[in-house]
Amino acid sequence: MALPDFSMRQLLEAGVHFGHQTHRWNPKMAPFIYGERNNIHILDLSQTVPLLNSALKVVSDTVARGGRVLYVGTKRQASDIIADAGNRSAQYYVNARWLGGMMTNWKTISNSIQRLRKLDELLAGEAQGFTKKERLNLEREREKLDRALGGIKDMGSVPDLMFIIDTNKEAIAIQEAKRLGIPVVAVIDSNCDPDQIDYPIPGNDDAARAIALYCDLIARAALDGIARQQGAMGIDVGAQVEAPVEPALQAPAEGA
């Protein structure tokens, strides 16, 4: 595998260059702004391209050395896309609500994850010994915990890198990452503060098509990292994803 490719045309078609209304801008974004049209800031895609490439490389490199990447996007138009990207690339995600202390108070979060696992076990069986009402209450508790923590249930500890959609909405997540020294990759729109972000990607953070494009590229970069890690461990990645080799073709390899 290799880092995912993308073109300037794809960025344009997804509306990555459209910022917010000019009166809503953050002056710190001035270096990333190309101009304005109809009172809307236009972001400079000639900067987005190399910065997005750098972000994809850091995601791939992090995963290749066995690191974990946490995707964060809780706004309505990002929620499903973030979860899909996390699942597809064997990474982790928060897509409902960022709970304060999710990273900085990992011990408490771990206890809640243990409770979620326990509920999974209880409800996977027949849940014998519970009344209908008790079972319903357990299901509700499980649903609430799964919504908040399902995407990080198997993470094991704090991540090595975070990828964020909407730095204003996810300000608490960024603060916690900074406190723990976790590097942050994030899309920065014209109303964002780029100073907080280690690997900024100047672009629209509201349009569903733009969000889908970023998440697809980040997920594919993570998959590239997995392939590189497995290659370094001597695992034949092709054998895992391709159809089984014909027995007749295997014979020479066995004798080699």
Curated annotation (Swiss-Prot):
Q: Which InterPro entries match?
A: Ribosomal_uS2, Ribosomal_uS2_bac/mit/plastid, Ribosomal_uS2_CS, Ribosomal_uS2_flav_dom_sf
- Its domain of life reads Bacteria
Q: Mind listing the GO molecular function terms for this protein? A: structural constituent of ribosome
Q: Which GO terms describe its biological process?
A: translation
Which Gene Ontology cellular component terms are annotated? cytosolic small ribosomal subunit
SUPFAM superfamilies xref list: Ribosomal protein S2 (SSF52313)
Keywords annotated in UniProt: Ribonucleoprotein, Ribosomal protein
Q: HAMAP family of this UniProt entry?
A: Ribosomal_uS2_B
The similarity annotation says: Belongs to the universal ribosomal protein uS2 family.
Q: What is this protein called?
A: Small ribosomal subunit protein uS2
Q: What species does this protein belong to?
A: Brucella melitensis biotype 1 (strain ATCC 23456 / CCUG 17765 / NCTC 10094 / 16M)
The gene for this chain is: rpsB
